[in-house]
């Protein structure tokens, strides 16, 4: 049962991060297409957002390790 819970925790967090990263990158590409002069500012904001979104799978991994080795 712990193995299933750990797999669900890491799977759902990876799924959420994948969807979030896709949305962030697509909106950034749309913004650059509309305003090419704002490319640098949009890219830095995008990288900060991706870093925050990638914290979710790391937390999912930690939670799955806690559940797995409990």
UniProtKB/Swiss-Prot annotation:
**Protein localization:** Cell membrane
Membrane topology, record value:
Multi-pass membrane protein
Enumerate the transmembrane spans.
Answer: 4-24, 47-67
* Site feature Reversibly protonated during proton transport, where: 54
Q: Does the keyword Transmembrane apply?
A: yes
Q: Which InterPro entries match?
A: ATP_synth_csu_bac/chlpt, ATP_synth_F0_csu, ATP_synth_F0_csu_DDCD_BS, ATP_synth_F0_csu_sf, ATPase_proteolipid_c-like_dom, F/V-ATP_Csub_sf
Keyword Transmembrane: yes or no? yes
Keywords attached to this entry? ATP synthesis, Cell membrane, CF(0), Hydrogen ion transport, Ion transport, Lipid-binding, Membrane, Transmembrane, Transmembrane helix, Transport
Main location class: membrane
Q: Which GO terms describe its cellular component?
A: plasma membrane; proton-transporting ATP synthase complex; proton-transporting two-sector ATPase complex, proton-transporting domain
The Swiss-Prot or TrEMBL record annotates one GO molecular function as: lipid binding
User: Subunit comment for this entry?
Assistant: F-type ATPases have 2 components, F(1) - the catalytic core - and F(0) - the membrane proton channel. F(1) has five subunits: alpha(3), beta(3), gamma(1), delta(1), epsilon(1). F(0) has three main subunits: a(1), b(2) and c(10-14). The alpha and beta chains form an alternating ring which encloses part of the gamma chain. F(1) is attached to F(0) by a central stalk formed by the gamma and epsilon chains, while a peripheral stalk is formed by the delta and b chains.
Q: Which PANTHER family match?
A: ATP SYNTHASE LIPID-BINDING PROTEIN, MITOCHONDRIAL, ATPASE PROTEIN 9
Protein role: F(1)F(0) ATP synthase produces ATP from ADP in the presence of a proton or sodium gradient. F-type ATPases consist of two structural domains, F(1) containing the extramembraneous catalytic core and F(0) containing the membrane proton channel, linked together by a central stalk and a peripheral stalk. During catalysis, ATP synthesis in the catalytic domain of F(1) is coupled via a rotary mechanism of the central stalk subunits to proton translocation.
> Which family is it part of?
Belongs to the ATPase C chain family.
Protein name, per record: ATP synthase subunit c
Give the species this sequence originates from. Answer: Staphylococcus carnosus (strain TM300)
**What gene does the UniProt entry assign to this protein?**
atpE
